[in-house]
Amino acid sequence: MAQIYAQTLTETAAALAQGTLTAEEAVRACIDRIEATEPAVHALLATRCEEALAEARAMDAAGYDPAKPLWGVPVTVKDVLSTSGVATTCGSRILENYVPFFDAAAVSRLKDAGAVILAKTNMDEFAMGSSTEKSAFKTTHNPWDLQRVPGGSSGGSAASVAAGQCFASLGTDTGGSVRQPASFCGCVGLKPTYGRVSRYGLVAYGSSLDQIGPVTRSVEDAARVLAVIAGHDARDTTCSDRPVDDYLAALGSRSDLAGLRIGVPAEYWGEGLSGEVDSCCREALKKAEELGATLVDISLPNSRHAIAVYYIVAMAEASSNLARFDGVRFGHRSDNAASLPELYINSRSEGFGDEVQRRIMLGTYVLSSGYYDAYYRKAAQVRRLILQDFEKAFEQCDVICGPASPVTAWKHGAMSGDPLTMYLLDIFTISLNLAGLPGLSLPVGTGTESGMPVGLQILGKAFDEATLLSVAHVLEQRIGRTPVAQI
């Protein structure tokens, strides 16, 4: 029998429902695993282990509640999501001592469903990064190889799930920040459609791009978490009131992929794609064909502009969103200021890291008088063309598949002196955020050169997460799940 910490969320929830496992035992198993692995992995920031144990004991005393689908299940939450009474730093010195008085909507829904919050996960500062090396507090290590990065910016979430520290984690995806670390750590990572999950209580980076999604050990786990956190919230004006599909029912809708048309974009299989990623993803597509799917060649011609468009839009929105952190009402306040302007300048210079400062300055530049039309307005126009490419492609196919990342996890420090190259590695994920569509990263093997996990990205139509999950579930059953990393 597998160790408790190595089970899936689905297996754990079933054991809790059957009474063969108590909430305290589930929480204790994860705490023990945290104590065993966290000194090496560094996935977590604030922890609440004693509080979680107390909550679990109270739940056991009250008895199992069938109305709560995640009753007693220990989870972690990315440190960009507000948690009442628990520090929410966004991985930044400027918010080092900030403790919110409210929960983000997604966190509230986890709690209402019976989940037990164990910890906040490490992240690139304000979600600006692809390696979780840009946190102000620690560098997170990939559980499959501690010399390598876990991806980012939700690297702490992916590492905590891969290491068995929890059964699921909430991350955020602005340009691939759930899907890429999930790929690097051998997890399932789901970015829902923009507006499917409330962003209330999420500290914004790119308001038109950000979306909250789960990192889990199986597709069914992702479906269970999404079913809990999805749905309308009047506090977020961008949150859709469209009815939420029955994601668990969708998993049982297919036994194979007969009749499914999979679009394969030429632009996702060209220069820059590593041989080991190419091999794993093509083998996964071959298995999809064996299951009855038809591969359709498609084109997403404007994806070649996606990097430029994304970084113009994201940095402009970051410049605006992060203007609120000035040392006046909350966050870091400089002790070296003789005037109010100096307070603003010094507080932000001391509180923000280099990468955040770089993006704020670039964002301010593209929004400035004389450059707005040349950069931001043009980027917005091309963004629309990117969405139109997807709409046209989906006339020929039901889902689109390609690599989640052109490479596997790189070694720590390999990209630190070359931020541009790191930006370019987002090429396969950012178009989806610009279009606001859903995507899922599914583990499909291990690279022959690096020995690291590889993820296949499955992209879908707006609000059609049910199809993504059903397709991924069938593929997962054929390929097999990636187990917990042994550290």
Swiss-Prot record:
A GO molecular-function annotation: glutaminyl-tRNA synthase (glutamine-hydrolyzing) activity
Pfam families in alphabetical order: Amidase (PF01425)
Protein's organism: Oleidesulfovibrio alaskensis (strain ATCC BAA-1058 / DSM 17464 / G20)
Assembly and binders: Heterotrimer of A, B and C subunits.
Protein's recorded name: Glutamyl-tRNA(Gln) amidotransferase subunit A
Record field: catalytic activity: L-glutamyl-tRNA(Gln) + L-glutamine + ATP + H2O = L-glutaminyl-tRNA(Gln) + L-glutamate + ADP + phosphate + H(+)
Listed GO CC annotations: glutamyl-tRNA(Gln) amidotransferase complex
Family: Belongs to the amidase family. GatA subfamily.
Catalytic activity, EC: 6.3.5.7
Superkingdom field: Bacteria
GO terms for biological process, alphabetical: translation
Catalytic residues of the enzyme: 78 (charge relay system), 153 (charge relay system), 177 (acyl-ester intermediate)
Gene3D superfamilies attached to this UniProt entry: Amidase signature (AS) domain
Its job: Allows the formation of correctly charged Gln-tRNA(Gln) through the transamidation of misacylated Glu-tRNA(Gln) in organisms which lack glutaminyl-tRNA synthetase. The reaction takes place in the presence of glutamine and ATP through an activated gamma-phospho-Glu-tRNA(Gln).
Top EC class, one word: ligase
